[in-house]
């Protein structure tokens, strides 16, 4: 099958187009013919080797982290899906590879595609949808009347998270450029802060939760806008000890993670708030719940551009510019 592959870690080594063996179907797998795949900043980070200590992939590695397609075959223990079903999925972190014509995904990571969406629209959802769901619903437990700040509202995670937070009944603030303020309001943001002109930490206070997609100084400054007992959830790092524990990390890696996150965890305690790192996991049941919200028109996909499969490298480069409004998708068939 045709695929886009990483042979060696590093930006300069890039991603090559090539032929790879068809995936092996395990007894609890669903074999999916991929029609479209989402393109995410995570793809570039994996290519560059940023996660090689935490996610020790065997190279060559097919890149790509979410998809929509049609079930071709199912393993002997699969009960929820059958050939011909239109599905969408985020594969488990150790079995990625959606920039390809076929993929085998464990049944519990798959859900029926929202009926109201095209394949390209559906492929834009899994990674960002699960990230927002696990941050706001699972970890954050956002409730009606709470105040939430979502950084980088015009990005893939941001455009989904704004809509989800609004659906949950929160007052939603976000940071974005003035050019994207209109889109942010359309998606449900109550407060839009122009990050080029205004300091969000001077504008906001008493937030119950901040979802940070930026890391660095933005992460640290976010502590200032939280009320006592508030939650800072970061998806750009640094990883925390709980994450290392979930990953089954070695003693050395656990120690390194504890050191890397010491400063932000200490600062959070000083502000009487909590910090946690989120590395989204595959979850077909949550994708099923997300599909219901989409079919009820509570959430809509936001897609910037769709690239043809042969232009996957260009799609990755476009995502790396940071200028995409919403998601970038590759159309495979």
Residue ranges of predicted features:
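Terminal helix/beta-alpha structural elements that buttress the NAD(P)+-binding lobe
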Residues: 1-26, 33-37, 44-68, 73-74, ...
């Amino acid at each position: 099958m045709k695929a886009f592959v990483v042979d060696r870690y590093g930006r300069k080594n890039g991603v090559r187009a090539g032929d790879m063996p068809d995936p092996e179907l395990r007894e609890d797998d669903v074999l999916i013919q991929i029609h479209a795949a989402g393109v995410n900043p995570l793809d570039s980070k994996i290519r560059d080797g940023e996660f090689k200590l935490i996610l020790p992939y065997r190279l060559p590695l097919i890149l790509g982290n979410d998809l929509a397609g049609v079930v071709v075959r199912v393993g002997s223990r699969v009960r929820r899906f059958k050939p011909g079903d239109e599905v969408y999925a985020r594969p488990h972190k150790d079995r990625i590879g959606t920039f390809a014509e076929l993929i085998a995904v464990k049944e519990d990571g798959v859900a029926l595609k929202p009926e109201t969406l095209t394949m390209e629209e559906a492929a834009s959802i899994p990674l960002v949808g699960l990230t927002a769901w696990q941050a706001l619903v699972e970890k954050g437990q956002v409730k009606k009347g709470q105040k939430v700040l979502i950084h980088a509202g015009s990005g893939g995670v941001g455009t989904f998270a704004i809509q989800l937070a609004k659906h949950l009944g929160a007052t939603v603030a976000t940071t974005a450029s003035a050019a994207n303020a209109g889109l942010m309001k359309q998606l449900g943001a109550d407060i839009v802060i122009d990050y080029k002109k205004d300091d969000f930490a001077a504008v906001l206070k008493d937030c119950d939760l901040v979802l940070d997609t930026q890391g660095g100084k933005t992460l640290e400054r976010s502590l200032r806008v939280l009320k006592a007992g508030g939650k800072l959830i970061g998806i750009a790092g640094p990883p925390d000890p709980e994450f290392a524990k979930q990953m089954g990390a070695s003693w050395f890696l656990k120690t390194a993670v504890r050191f890397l996150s010491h400063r932000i965890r200490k600062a959070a305690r000083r502000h009487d708030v909590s910090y946690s790192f989120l590395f989204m996991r595959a979850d077909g049941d949550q994708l099923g719940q997300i599909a219901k919200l989409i079919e009820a028109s509570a959430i809509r996909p936001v897609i910037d551009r769709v690239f043809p499969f042969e232009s996957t490298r260009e799609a990755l480069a476009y995502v790396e510019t940071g200028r995409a409004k919403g998601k970038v998708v590759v159309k495979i068939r």
